[in-house]
Amino acid sequence: MRQVNRKRPYARILPLLVIISVIVAATVTGCGTSTGSAAPASAAPAKQLVFYSAQGYDSAMAKAFQAKTGIQVKLVDDSTGKIVAKIDAERSNPHWDVAWFDGDSTMQGLDNEGMLLQNWTPKDVSNLTALGQSLVPADKAYYPASVTAAAAIGVNTKLLSPDQYPKDWRDLLTPVFKNSLAMNDPSISGPTYPYVAGIMDIMGTAQGKQYFQDLKANGLRVFPTNDNTLKALLAGQVKAVTIQDSALAAAEVKGDPIKIIYPSSGVFTLPGVIAINKNAPDMAAAKQFVEYVLSPAGQKVMADVKNGGGDSYFNPVINGIQPNPARQQSGINWVKVDPIKAAKDENSLKKWFHDNIVQ
Amino acid sequence: MITSSNKAEHTKAEHIGSRLRHWGSGAGDVPGAILLVVLIAYPLATLLGQALLPHLFSKPMSLLPSLAPLRSVFGSKLNLEALVNSLSIGLAEAVLAIALGSFSALALARVPRKVGVVLDAFIWVVFFVPSYVIAQGWVILMQDKGILAQLTGLPNGWSAWFFTRFGLVLIMGLRYFPYVHFGMQEALLHINQDLVQAGRAAGAGRRQIMTKIILPLLTPAWLAGGSIAFAEGFGDFGIAAAITPQAHIPMATYQIYASLSEAPVNYPAAAGMSMVVVLVTAAAIVLQFWWLKKRNYNTLSSAASRDPAGGSNRRSMAVGVAALLFVALFLPLGATLCASLWKTWSGGMSAGNWTLSHYFRALRLGGDGWQALGRSLEYSLVTAFLTMSMALVVGFQMSFKDSRLSRLLNILTMSVIAVPGIVLAASFIFAWNAVWLIPIHLVLYGTPVCLAMAYIASSLPYAIRLEVGAMSQLPANILKAAESFGARNRTVIRKIVLPLVRGTAISTFFMTFTGVMFELPASSLLYPPGQPTFSVLIQSKFDNFDWSGGAALTVIGLVVVFAAYGLGRCLVYYSARVRAEKAQQADRDMVPAAGG
């Protein structure tokens, strides 16, 4: 009996066939693409650009750039958190050329790890506005292409009368907002950390922490991300939220009853920053792309709501660019959050927030 | 998330396996082992390894070991609390899933066949619908000023009880009961009627037969389904984030996500926490094996059974399952459907707020959208086929080879279910983008192959469990009989094993097919630049606060999936009928021959 069973051709051949076919397919495809993005160690013959981005208008920008230059743009569009996770996981063998997302302290984190091309100056850099200039780091590792507010106050106009609208951050401590204010968890939501860091900046660390604790005592709700927070506002679960202004703008233009308020003591700059990989496989194309984004033609692509949705409601940082008229431009008191300090304090401040406010 | 069912009756398999220990010998389980190593063990090792070698992927690479990541995991009180929360929620939810799944399986065995087919198909739908649709649907329905409040004028705060861990357990139980249902359903067909008859003859009542004979005999089935439900709940992030956003129950996966959003991304900490998740799940599985080993469940009979029940009882059973489906499926799916038809989110259910424009917009996807849909269909078909084949091979080996290697791999593949998808996806970057692969041109990261491998890795554990379950139904006697008539293994597999597990193989195919269509973590971290999948496209709608657009795309994707599933079912039904006709024809041919 065993003699028969020792010969088991079928049982052995079938799995082997499967494995062989997988390995063959893998090798063929692996080799086939290794001249492209898969193995940056080898020089790419065809002109291309691998572009990681979390911006709403990235796809339109990629197409416009490709049409203008003939350089093929391969886009990976995702949330900032996933883009950064991907870049960090690739760090020993990076595939990307250009990265673009909101949040200079996050980008500063990548710079601190030595991943970004430093001391490169795009042409036309003198076109940056004063606000724009102030957002360029000393080592020139990344450039601002737009500015939004890390947090503004969004109120549901169906639930509050205009005289109840808050004017500044501290107005949110009044009984009007008892159990009716929400924000995001900075440990999970990317743009929320600059907001928390910004409050510490303008109020001082001790008072800033006290402010969040007072909000908590007034019934502040902390949701994981913009998604939950904005839905809570629209459904009427809360009367006001403090989240990134472009997210509020996105809902406002769709016809939802939202009014965006920029607190008088200041809102915190959340620049959309663009950077080049220090070991970019396609360095020349990468530089050309960043220059295109900062040019008037590129800015026009960004400001078109058809391309970027809510992300198109930004404040320009390039001189002579017409901002989207639907967005408030004047009367905003911008407070610049120092990205180097913010990046340094990030983990300890997030932990404090989690232990004292979220919990 | 890959949804799937489980029909594993592992111990039965092991029992037969141990009897057949000498049935095969030598290196028979090596091919399966290689598959699992390449697809699961190696990627996971590159990630979990960072818990001990935190600089494994730094530049320059360093193999300097460090206990710091593990110390930080075990030293933190919050992590401990998170683990306890995840465990208790996973357990509670698994118990609920077992109760619901047992009820639905037992009930469907009693209702009239036609009603049963319809209800069964809807349970498959519960299975297919992506978790985020269910979770989001419940939120839209239950929140203050949500759909229910709008329809009935309930005051704010009416649903506070729901957005707690009780609501979470409830939703997860409703989400994962099909695992138990499908496991039990198969096992129920093969209950040894002799034992039931014996019980009746000894004067046992209906209730006694159920509690003393049928349910104990089904232990492997509900434990196997329950263990998947546990692993799913233990490793959940999305449902908890949606249902309990403000109650904030720290769970193990929350801690993993928080370390992934640290700056720089703290992979060693995520690895340490994931390692704990894997160990706990593995311990749960080992415990289950140990529990099953103590008893003998080898009570298979080949005769299908159908318990005769009274008419009114049948009707109430059918109504019960329909009610379960109403809560588990129609409420959340209906809420999502409504939301996809709203002009504005804040407008809610008000009369003037309805539009089809999101669907028109979604169908006018443009070239990119259709390409993404086509791409996802291609991935789905290819990975479903490969997963089905591999699960057959590995399942066969696990069922009939009781080697330590296969048992270890079995535990490992199950543990993978509890690892958050994003962690498994990141591990594929580390594994297939590693510097040591550059000289041999095997940097698969960034190619479609890498994404397909990740899809297979995340669906294989479910598929294998399903195959092992189906194969454990094969009476060892048949195989032995075939053997003693001199049949070679090839013949045994082709003529006996394959025909008997055909249905399961087809189930694993559709499970993978639909899972891949909506899979997100691996898709978004691993898709080749410039070639997004359909799920990535949907997610980018949600990321840009176009919820109605995202919901409309999801519904379109679901329609595609249902169409594929319906087509598959028709094919199976048709081929079964053709086979039956052929067999009848053969019988008819035989009779005159014998008579003449």
Region locations from a protein language model:
Chain A
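Immediate post-signal peptide segment of exported/extracytoplasmic ligand-binding proteins
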Residues: 35-50, 63-69, 92, 174-176
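Short, low-complexity disordered leader/linker segments with a strong preference
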Residues: 1-48, 359
